[in-house]
Amino acid sequence: MITKEFLQYTGFCAPIISSLGCAIMLVLFRHTHAKSEEGTLHRLLVSYFLLVSLGWICSLVYVYLPLLYVRINILYYLIVFWSQVVFYQFIYTLTRLPGEKPFSRIHYIFPLVIVGTFAVWSAFVPFETQVYIVTSRGEVAPGYEAYSRFFTARLLLRGIWNIAYTALAWWRLLAYRRSISDYSANADRTSLAWVTLLLLISFSLVPPSLLSAIFSKKILIASLLLLIPQLLLVAQHAVVCYNM
């Protein structure tokens, strides 16, 4: 009989395995078949898959190794932001028209400011207090109420960040559709039906991220609700690899 604990552990491991598998396949494909002009796209995707795998490894550490998580939580916070930025840069590059300005690096700098601020704040919070916040699954530490709430709000912030960058990606795709008159004339780069599917899957990841606004972390981790974004991510990875 498949136990609940086994399903939870498998759910955490699934996006790690799928993202690492996709990264390896893209690297191998790049060395044997890819065109030189597609190099940037492949590098972005490999970076995205590696960030996703690292992010879910950090999530696994949060659940099973809380002491280690406290030491790497700044890294996890940065990965949460940057993975979505890299994904958007991939969409931006894929739909970039001749003469259009290159991707702005400000998208990477803004998360550094947020995470840097949190890192400085964390430096003034005792290690034991941070461990308590993690092991209690989101309980407010006495005397550190604001920090506790910010520390445990990452799923919610991740959902908001996802909404913002998925909306930007949709805007890019719609603008691209308006700018070209014949998709078939650019078939090498755009059979964009799959990009639409990719964005739909990405947008479907938003509601699970916002579950933390409804349920406590104790309930989320103890339930199977996290299987939803985990399985959707595996589907997203399959769509990308199949079409690249």
Where are these regions (language model features)?
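Helix-loop junctions on the outward
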Residues: 35, 54-76, 208-222
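The cytoplasmic-loop to transmembrane-helix boundary for the fourth helix
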Residues: 95-128, 134-135, 146-155, 185-202
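Hydrophobic alpha-helical transmembrane segments of multi-pass membrane proteins
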Residues: 15-25, 43-63, 83, 113-121, ...
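Alpha-helical transmembrane segments of multi-pass integral membrane proteins
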Residues: 35-54, 108, 148-212, 223-232
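Hydrophobic transmembrane alpha-helical segments in integral membrane proteins
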Residues: 1-21, 155-159
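Membrane-embedded alpha-helical segments of multi-pass membrane proteins
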Residues: 15-21, 75-86, 157, 228-236
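Membrane-interface segments at the starts/ends of alpha-helical transmembrane spans
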Residues: 2-5, 68-72, 137-155, 219-225
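Internal transmembrane alpha-helix with an interfacial aromatic "cap," most often the third helix
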Residues: 23-29, 81-106
